[in-house]
């Protein structure tokens, strides 16, 4: 591999005798892995589990497979999986993933929350925020709001609000050189220092959003000390934080002069490059006096939703019902009014109000477990291939007309309308594949 000018010399100085093994590891193939989604009701048994992780496995799952389409698995390399594992929120917590796209860490945080509490997944890039929405919906997370904002604008709404903030910061990307060689095109000796300036700027806003006793998990996919240990030392000097120890598992090593932090090198850890630090906020931020979100449905809309829910659902969905145009969303409770922010997904998309009727969304059919739905229809592998390509499906027998959750391998793939023995196609056009 042809490294950028100055890279080899830098890491020979940092790593000493280990530099040779470190540099040789770039000639090896990048490590692929995925996580199994514990929010799904019909798990599949997978081999080659990643040691000391709850849901991780080495290997690849096709993006065109039923496992991927239903959100049962999420592809994410092993080092990246360690960040949310360090954060490990408890159900009921208020959590912010500040730089969330494409969604690996947010889906993992949502798995820990298990539908309780609030997860705000933020992405400043509009294009990447759309990908984030797709991945969160496929995962079936019900308590997630996706915002498309800068950290400073979020800070105006969420002062002192979050129990946990995860920042996988924009960085020089050295840890991705093996997986994405194009990342080397941007690298220069002074690039890490440029990135560090942006990281400090984002973190300054992040700190103001922490509740007293709240935790901050800071990570990068680079090895540059300027963006890692130097940033952590800056946080400890500028703000009232305690540095919490990160458990070094699976070949992680201590950070440079900061043994509580963790580094992942590809010659020691079976994965790509990552740094992670875990801090607890001891300072005080003004307690937020925010206006809570409220339902804005008309009586007719409430009646239409209740009619659908009574006929099709076995559970009551907790949260705040809000319409945006003719679209119905379920917002997490205790969420501030987000009217001043750019929103990419305002909670769980439940469906659409049409003339005197309500049509369920694809996202709702992904989020609900089969045990929570009164009517479902299972399709086999052959029918799945046709369905995701946009075709209608001929069922083996006629069913009563109406809406059914489509199941593949026991997991939801949206809702669809059945007429007799015909399953109409409601798989979103933008997601279809052959």
Model-derived features with residue positions:
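Conserved class I S-adenosyl-L-methionine
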Residues: 92-101
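A short acidic, Gly/Pro-enriched loop at the edge of an enzyme's catalytic core
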Residues: 90-91, 155-166
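Class I S-adenosyl-L-methionine
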Residues: 162, 215-218, 222-329
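S-adenosyl-L-methionine
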Residues: 124-159
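Helix-to-beta-strand junctions that scaffold the AdoMet/dcAdoMet cofactor pocket
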Residues: 114, 210-212
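Polybasic, low-complexity RNA-engagement segments
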Residues: 1-40, 272-275, 282-434
């Amino acid at each position: 591999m042809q490294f950028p000018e100055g890279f080899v010399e830098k890491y020979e100085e940092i790593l000493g005798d280990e530099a040779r093994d470190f540099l040789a590891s770039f000639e090896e193939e990048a490590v692929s892995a995925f996580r199994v989604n514990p929010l799904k009701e019909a798990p599949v048994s997978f081999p080659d589990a990643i040691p000391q992780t709850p849901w991780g496995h080495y290997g690849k799952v096709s993006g065109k497979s039923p496992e991927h389409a239903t959100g049962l698995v999420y592809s994410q390399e092993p080092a990246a999986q360690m960040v949310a594992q360090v954060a490990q929120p408890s159900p009921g917590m208020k959590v912010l993933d500040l730089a969330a796209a494409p969604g690996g860490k947010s889906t993992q945080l949502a798995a820990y929350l298990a539908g309780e509490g609030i997860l705000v997944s933020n992405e400043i890039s509009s294009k990447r925020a759309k990908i984030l929405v797709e991945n969160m919906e496929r995962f079936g997370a019900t308590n997630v709001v996706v915002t498309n904002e800068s950290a400073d604008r979020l800070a105006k709404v969420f002062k002192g609000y979050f129990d946990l903030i995860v920042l996988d910061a924009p960085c020089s990307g050295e840890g991705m050189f093996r997986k994405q060689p194009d990342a080397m095109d941007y690298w220069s000796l002074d690039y890490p220092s440029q990135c560090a300036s942006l990281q400090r700027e984002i973190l300054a806003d992040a700190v103001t959003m922490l509740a007293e006793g709240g935790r901050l998990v800071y990570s990068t996919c680079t090895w540059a000390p300027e963006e890692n240990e130097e940033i952590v030392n800056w946080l400890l000097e500028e703000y009232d934080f305690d540095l919490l120890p990160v458990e070094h598992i699976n070949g992680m090593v201590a950070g440079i002069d900061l043994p509580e932090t963790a580094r992942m090198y590809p010659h020691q850890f079976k994965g790509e490059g990552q740094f992670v630090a875990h801090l607890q906020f001891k300072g005080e931020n003004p307690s937020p006096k925010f206006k809570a979100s409220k339902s804005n449905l008309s009586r007719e809309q409430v009646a239409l939703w209740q009619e659908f829910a009574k006929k099709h659902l076995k559970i009551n969905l907790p949260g705040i019902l809000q319409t945006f145009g003719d679209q119905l969303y379920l917002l997490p409770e205790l969420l501030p009014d987000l009217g001043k922010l750019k929103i990419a997904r305002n909670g769980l998309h439940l469906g659409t109000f049409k003339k005197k009727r309500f049509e369920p969304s694809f996202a709702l059919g992904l989020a609900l477990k089969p045990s929570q739905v009164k009517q479902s229809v299972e399709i086999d592998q052959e029918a799945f291939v046709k369905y995701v390509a946009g075709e209608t499906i001929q069922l083996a027998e006629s069913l009563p007309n109406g809406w059914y959750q489509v199941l593949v391998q026991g997991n939801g793939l949206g809702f669809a309308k059945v007429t007799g023995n015909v399953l109409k196609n409601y798989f979103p056009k933008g997601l279809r594949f052959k």
